[in-house]
From Swiss-Prot:
Subcellular location, record wording: Nucleus
Gene3D superfamilies in UniProt: Leucine-rich Repeat Variant (1.25.10.10)
Keywords associated with the record: Acetylation, Cell cycle, Cell division, Mitosis, Nucleus, Phosphoprotein, Repeat
Biased segments, Basic and acidic residues type: 1172-1184, 1196-1214, 1225-1243, 1265-1274
Designated name of the protein: Sister chromatid cohesion protein PDS5 homolog B
Similarity section: Belongs to the PDS5 family.
Composition bias, Low complexity: 1156-1167, 1378-1387
Recorded name of the encoding gene: Pds5b
Modified residues (Phosphothreonine): 1366, 1369, 1380
UniProt keyword annotation of Manganese present: no
Molecular-function annotations in GO: DNA binding
Segments of skewed composition (Polar residues): 1137-1155, 1358-1371
Record PTM Phosphoserine, positions in chain: 1140, 1162, 1166, 1176, 1182, 1191, 1221, 1257, 1259, 1283, 1357, 1365, 1368, 1382, 1416, 1419
Job description of the protein: Regulator of sister chromatid cohesion in mitosis which may stabilize cohesin complex association with chromatin. May couple sister chromatid cohesion during mitosis to DNA replication. Cohesion ensures that chromosome partitioning is accurate in both meiotic and mitotic cells and plays an important role in DNA repair. Plays a role in androgen-induced proliferative arrest in prostate cells.
Taxonomic source organism: Rattus norvegicus (Rat)
Amino acid sequence: MAHSKTRTNDGKITYPPGVKEISDKISKEEMVRRLKMVVKTFMDMDQDSEEEKELYLNLALHLASDFFLKHPDKDVRLLVACCLADIFRIYAPEAPYTSPDKLKDIFMFITRQLKGLEDTKSPQFNRYFYLLENIAWVKSYNICFELEDSNEIFTQLYRTLFSVINNGHNQKVHMHMVDLMSSIICEGDTVSQELLDTVLVNLVPAHKNLNKQAYDLAKALLKRTAQAIEPYITNFFNQVLMLGKTSISDLSEHVFDLILELYNIDSHLLLSVLPQLEFKLKSNDNEERLQVVKLLAKMFGAKDSELASQNKPLWQCYLGRFNDIHVPIRLECVKFASHCLMNHPDLAKDLTEYLKVRSHDPEEAIRHDVIVSIVTAAKKDILLVNDHLLNFVRERTLDKRWRVRKEAMMGLAQIYKKYALQSAAGKDAAKQICWVKDKLLHIYYQNSIDDRLLVERIFAQYMVPHNLETTERMKCLYYLYATLDLNAVKALNEMWKCQNLLRHQVKDLLDLIKQPKTDASVKAIFSKVMVITRNLPDPGKAQDFMKKFTQVLEDDEKIRKQLEALVSPTCSCKQAEGCVREITKKLGNPKQPTNPFLEMIKFLLERIAPVHIDTESISALIKQVNKSIDGTADDEDEGVPTDQAIRAGLELLKVLSFTHPISFHSAETFESLLACLKMDDEKVAEAALQIFKNTGSKIEEDFPHIRSALLPVLHHKSKKGPPRQAKYAIHCIHAIFSSKETQFAQIFEPLHKSLDPSNLEHLITPLVTIGHIALLAPDQFAAPLKSLVATFIVKDLLMNDRLPGKKTTKLWVPDEEVSPETMVKIQAIKMMVRWLLGMKNNHSKSGTSTLRLLTTILHSDGDLTEQGKISKPDMSRLRLAAGSAIVKLAQEPCYHEIITLEQYQLCALAINDECYQVRQVFAQKLHKGLSRLRLPLEYMAICALCAKDPVKERRAHARQCLVKNITVRREYLKQHAAVSEKLLSLLPEYVVPYTIHLLAHDPDYVKVQDIEQLKDVKECLWFVLEILMAKNENNSHAFIRKMVENIKQTKDAQGPDDTKMNEKLYTVCDVAMNIIMSKSTTYSLESPKDPVLPARFFTQPDKNFSNTKNYLPPEMKSFFTPGKPKTANVLGAVNKPLSSAGKQSQTKSSRMETVSNASSSSNPSSPGRIKGRLDSTEMDHSENEDYTMSSPLPGKKSDKREDSDLVRSELEKPRSRKKASVTDPEEKLGMDDLSKLVQEQKPKGSQRGRKRGHAASESEEQQWPEEKRHKEELLGNEDEQNSPPKKGKRGRPPKPLGGTSKEEPVVKTSKKGNKKKPAPPVVDEDEEEERQMGNTEQKSKSKQQRTSKRAQQRAESPETSAVESTQSTPQKGRGRPSKTPSPSQPKKNIRVGRSKQVATKENDSSEEMDVLQASSPVSDDTTQEGAEEEDISAGNVRRRSSKRERR
């Protein structure tokens, strides 16, 4: 090919063949055509063509002229750029351009052309790609390293490439760009900050989100150049982080984002930077620390991050930020936890301790987020969270903030549904969270209506989902009920009871609305609205919304009809859902973003809609029970023994028979129940009888074949069945049959005739049956009953001791060891009481003579004939029966009036009986009558005597009873403002005169001026006054003061002329007055009204006599210390997130929550005494844990305690204010051993006094169960209660050796049993009566077994336990006059103190507990199950004490 004849050496330009001169004189199109040919020529050339290189040198120089570099046409520029790229390739390594400025212009020109890469759809894109490929391949830009302006060129190139890259580019474009840029970094001497910024800016989140491809390009570039670029990155961070030179780069503010991105790209890029972060974590700048924490949270929490294992110091330093003083930092740490738990299960152990502290953070948001983090991880996989973490969620269900409680409850519910109901992770996972169902239901004990509504919602949606098909739903409920613990069962029963009650209230409201409008009906509607309002959240708003809803119901018949259908007893579950849907749909129009009115009505509808139980459901449930009976159910697969499942199923049906009786009305159901009646299991038959009693009202009319089959069974049960079945058989006949008189006659006559006092074994059932017939049909058998009582019951049974009792010094034995004669006598007493309660009058003086008989039994210690034939345990049983009988009769007004003051005072002393079980059961009977407002107010004064009980748990229980009863009365008065005529019998403050009178007549109060006896009086008064004075409502302090002043102006009505008696009365008044003055600042104000004193107890005040004398000895003054009484019922204390009852005080840093710092002066006592054994807040759960008796105030107390993972041990000295020393369990055991040694050195008591002075010492009461068992084994052959107790004052623990007392380790018990038991909502009153005494044996039997190892099996029957431990330590023959009066012994005066710290802590913990329990939702019918568990452990504690005293 011939060339144009232009020589190269004369500066003329040689063009490739066929290409004419390219100048500004030709058109653009022609120029483009010619340039394309030039491009082709250069493209085909290679570096070896020396001749051609020489030939086209001038052309190469010409193409670099400004004419081309600044040409306006982009196509021209592109072609020129491609030529220049090839020229650099061909002439490499020496470019034909020598001028630095020209080189800069050329590379800036090429860079500009690279922008054309942006449009991938351009026809020229391939040429742009060629340009990129060429310069990347040749590394043309490396020429610029020598240029002064190289940084500007590179920076421009980088910016251009990062700006043009987009998702239209393929992998090759991406790769060439990386090649081009990486060569500049890897082969250059330095990387300027500006160039580094152009790379790093693409990692900043804002840029990253705008151009993901640029981010990927930067990422690839950094990975490729990691080694080369690392020093420059380190320098950059060093400048910004350590030296604070933020001006060196615009990216300084994004430094933490960059670190994260760089770490994710390649951790080696930050090898030298990470240690700087440790320094930054300790910065004084809150915001800076927060930034670093946010950064590290992402770095540590990232899925494949190994940072925690690679950089342990940084990890530890980061964990320290969980305790940062700045709230947002702690919040950030907590939020990070869920990612960490999910992505790095191996770090869970490290996080647990820190999350524990944060779960007690004073900031609500942080406690909330701890829950969220743990629950989020658990929902992903239950194996990611350990038991400790789940326990933190459990604890927070008792948080003081609703938001936190709600999150914890919902979290647990979701976890339960996923792993227990749906078995998402197998049986092991289900086992791990089996406690959740119990825990969630325990929350129903909370006072807060929000908590209870949420439990109801959780139950309906997560525990037994209402949308399950009926059979599946009932199976779910059946096995749930069979596996719940006792507390949860009672809570669930209570839930159904509350819902049923509310359903009836709404039904009543609808009935009232349908009546014609009158003033009376409007008042009745308002009253009903107020009752319903109390069952909804936010009563203030609820009241307004309920009024509005009432108006809607009056105006809108459709809604009213739907609501009527919903509350109808025949409403099915499906129908209920339809009704709720329709009502909410109508109320929801017009639609609003938020409609609080609709939300409130939804709450109401949720509570009353029967979404679980209808006739079909009951039928399905019965079938499920039948399957278990037939052995075709999968009980074992569900982890429930068949017997337990059947029993639980019948119990469940029994409860539902109270709340949904109509749903049982089907032949199939009744036939199945008939089959259950014939089963051998007594409990099953008993439950079936109760179900018939509750649901059988229509059997006679609708199911005649059931009636005829049932009647002979009932006759047989009432004559020859077990006593409890006999009782229910009689009640069934009464409920079902219209011909009940005939039936009763057919049963009564043969039983009456066959009564044989010599055949004791067969007397109990007839006595029970006759007693209940007498109760239900008193007039039908009036004459035969009267003669039966007079001749057979009193003369033949009670006044006769046929068989000598076993010789033993035990005070209590199990039922099977009680002599048959005593069991018959107990039933005889009960039969008399039922007869009197049926008669309800004293016309024939039968009540008077019965009361005389009962008090004689009490007076004679249970040995009515005083022949000495009856054994001590039998005497205890008879004392209990007599005391309980008087309490029962006192609940009937006609008998209350005839109980004399002496009889009342003697009955009161049963609460200080020497036998623990007598005290315990009597207290429960007393509480039951009081809490139902059936017992007169003077019986509440008896609780004051509990201050003398040596066992802390008994004092604690008595205090709970008082709190509950005072609360019940105050609530009643608030809700029934019109009952002012009953004020004297209801106002709790009126218990003060009765208490003063009772204490003045206390047989222990002998010497009027005796300091020790007066201190006892003060204890008892403070026991009552502390709770009454906790709040000064309506100036009640002044009212109480006025009452006490008025008493001093009267005389004792029991002995108005007895000077000594009146002096005692005035002295007790002065003790009360000193307490009031020392504890109140408002006592001197004017009393709101003049108190009226009970005329039976006090004479009319003498107007002419002013009794201003002070009857107290001067030295008593020092025992009244000023200070405010601790609050008995403060709602704010309900859910302290950081203090669990019984915990030791924590440091501020560990708790970060303030607790009340009540000093020991809050009890009116000597300085050496702290807080009294039972101060207002001293509910030392350490001892109380095992005592899960049917507390009047069940619920949260033990929950809080259960959650506490700290144990307390104190060594205290009298009059000491030292901080309690907190020891670990090993140390505590050591202290146990120490106390044992001390005891062994004590001389044994040689006298047996009638009265027991020594209380169970605290250290023995609080021993670890295993330690106790060990001691029992060592001393197994020694009967702890046989040892004669030393003489001393009633129930007051004497001064221990050396004047010090050790409170030793908290008794650890299973979490399962340590809640207070609520009574079932639907319990037959008499049934409870019968169970109480008959089952103390069961209660006692398990005492010895109650070790922590076996505590989990609490729900199982304790029949197999050893008998030895059932004995009760004689406290002392409290109150019954001694047959051989012993001279009063001086009492050691030092009160054992407890440390100020612990006292303070106890304040908090039990303040919480009191409130939790003060208005527990659960009814106070203290049933056997409730009482059982407290007694079980009571024995353990009491047994220890007698050992100690004997030594």
